[in-house]
């Protein structure tokens, strides 16, 4: 409940149209499959310092939803990476350095916001 109040306050402050829904912890596999079912047309990305930079126009215009997976401090496990590959997740770099989770989430949000702005401008 506390986190939902924080999400509501943040959404109001940033004048967001939608309110994010928060849920309790799940296994990585369960969470990824749940997101895939809920958003079947979403582009699935994961943070990877060796991944590609997002290029404006590189994705289909009808795919406007994003699922972003940010790994733990030590990186994704081999099993998690295998699952991401099976699900056709794209490794994406948002910074030339490895970021902490708090910073990575903000960086991904900023990069995707800019990406959508540049794609819409085309």
Residue ranges and their predicted role:
Residues 38-82, 90-93:
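Active-site/ligand-binding-proximal alpha/beta "capping" segment
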Residues 12-16, 52, 110:
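Charged, amphipathic alpha-helical interaction segments
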Residues 1-43:
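RNA substrate-binding interface of SAM-dependent RNA methyltransferases
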Residues 20-23, 73, 97, 101:
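Glycine- and other small-residue-rich loops at beta-strand/loop junctions that grip anionic moieties
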Residues 78-122:
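Structured adenosyl-cofactor binding patch, chiefly the S-adenosyl-L-methionine
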Residues 17, 64, 87:
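Structured loop/turn residues at beta-strand edges in well-structured enzyme cores
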Residues 27-28, 52-54, 99:
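Short acidic loop-to-helix transition motifs that present clustered carboxylates
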């Amino acid at each position: 409940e506390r986190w939902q109040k924080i999400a509501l306050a943040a959404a109001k402050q940033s004048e967001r149209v939608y309110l994010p829904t928060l849920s309790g912890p799940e296994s990585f596999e369960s969470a990824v499959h749940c997101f895939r079912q809920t958003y079947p047309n979403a582009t699935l990305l994961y943070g990877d310092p060796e991944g590609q930079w997002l290029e404006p126009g590189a994705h289909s215009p009808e795919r406007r939803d994003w699922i972003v997976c940010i790994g733990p401090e030590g990186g994704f496990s081999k099993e998690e990476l295998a699952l991401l590959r099976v699900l056709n997740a794209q490794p994406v770099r948002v910074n030339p350095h490895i970021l902490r989770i708090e910073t990575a989430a903000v960086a991904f949000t900023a990069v995707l916001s800019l990406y959508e702005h540049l794609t819409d401008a085309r």
